[in-house]
Amino acid sequence: VAEFIRAMGVDPGLAQTGYAVVEVSDKKGIARVWDTISTDPKDSMSKRLHKIFTDFEKIFKKWNVDILILEGIYVLPKYPNAALQLGAVKGVVSLAAAIENVEVRELKPTEVKMALTGNGRARKDQVERAVRKIFMFKDRIRSDHASDALALALVGLSRYGMIKW
């Protein structure tokens, strides 16, 4: 039986949180699932956070994730409230991970962009193209959030010596 590790990349957001599970065996990565969790902007903050938490509880259980790679918070100074929202989302995702004994690590967006494209200020489409090339996807990844989550999982696994591309 081949040994493998499963990593989940998460691009946190209150409206949409991207996630992706990448399985690694023999230093090769296979994307198992990538998607977004959406919340209703009409709902209260606590209800939205609860939805994100319960969805991640289910995802961690279903995919038996070993390591979570969360995107670090990057917020423009003119949107300070966004930092608070992202921090809350990261908190509930981290809590769901802790309950399932999933190790949590964090990467800055600039680190991920630099590792995949050679440019720490790469655009979303450049990151998506790099991710598609590594996984040999023919079709464009529909969601930027899911694409970013795949990128986080890849770079996190690479950073810790578990994968090569």
Cite the ranges covered by each PLM segment.
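Phosphate- and other anionic-substrate recognition elements at nucleic-acid/protein interfaces
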Residues: 1-165
